Amino acid sequence: MKIAEIKEMSTNDLVERVEAEVVNYNQMVINHSISPLENPAQIKQLRRTIARMRTELRQRELNNK
C-alpha cells in the first residue's frame, strides 16, 4: 500500500485496516514457521505497511492536539 493511499483513508478505516493487517501478519508468520512461504519477503512488506499506517495514525493524533 502506498503512502498516498494511506493518507486518503479516514482515521476509522485506517484503524480497522491496521487491526486486520496485524492479524494477517501474525497468521503469515505462523504459517511461515510451519512451512516456508513461496515469497518470504511478503512478511517484510506487510510489516512495513503496518508501520506506515501506524505512523500516519500517530501523525494525525499529534496534529489534532
UniProtKB/Swiss-Prot annotation:
One MF term in the entry's GO annotations: structural constituent of ribosome
Biological process according to GO: translation
Cellular component, GO annotation: ribonucleoprotein complex; ribosome
A Pfam entry, by short name: Ribosomal_L29
UniProtKB keywords: Ribonucleoprotein, Ribosomal protein
Family the UniProt entry places it in: Belongs to the universal ribosomal protein uL29 family.
Protein name: Large ribosomal subunit protein uL29
Gene: rpmC
